[in-house]
């Protein structure tokens, strides 16, 4: 897919990347990446968190059913904010930055991507 996308010159958002191959191809496209609950345990997602350039990571849940699937437990709606904060902290840990820096980088990525 990355090879096909490269021919279009578009800004790409790679949603919930979880493959143990091809990450370099998506990095070469200067893609944005979403991080979901897989950041806690999935080695491929953790590698994205480590290697994506600054300002190219977005944090999301993909909905509560996806969060429940990834975490293997019920996730009530009122836990959504805490889950997003925990994912930001985990990404910060993997990147060797403070949670505040990670939060600012994710916010900057959102604003750059969506023109906010």
Placement of each model-derived feature along the sequence:
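Catalytic pocket-lining loop regions of alpha/beta-barrel enzymes
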Residues: 1-58
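Mid-to-C-terminal alpha-helical segments outside catalytic/metal-binding sites
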Residues: 81-116
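Short acidic/histidine-rich active-site segments
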Residues: 55-77
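Residues at secondary-structure transition points
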Residues: 43, 75-82
């Amino acid at each position: 897919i990355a090879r096909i996308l490269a021919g279009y010159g578009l800004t790409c958002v790679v949603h919930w990347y979880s493959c143990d191959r091809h990450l370099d191809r998506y990095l070469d496209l200067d893609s944005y990446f979403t991080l979901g609950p897989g950041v806690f345990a999935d080695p491929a997602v953790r590698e994205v968190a480590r290697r994506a350039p600054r300002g190219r990571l977005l944090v999301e849940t993909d909905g509560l059913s996806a969060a429940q699937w990834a975490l293997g437990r019920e996730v009530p709606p009122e836990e959504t904010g805490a889950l997003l904060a925990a994912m930001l902290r985990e990404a910060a840990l993997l990147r060797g930055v403070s949670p505040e820096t990670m939060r600012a980088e994710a916010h900057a990525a959102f604003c750059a991507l969506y023109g906010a």
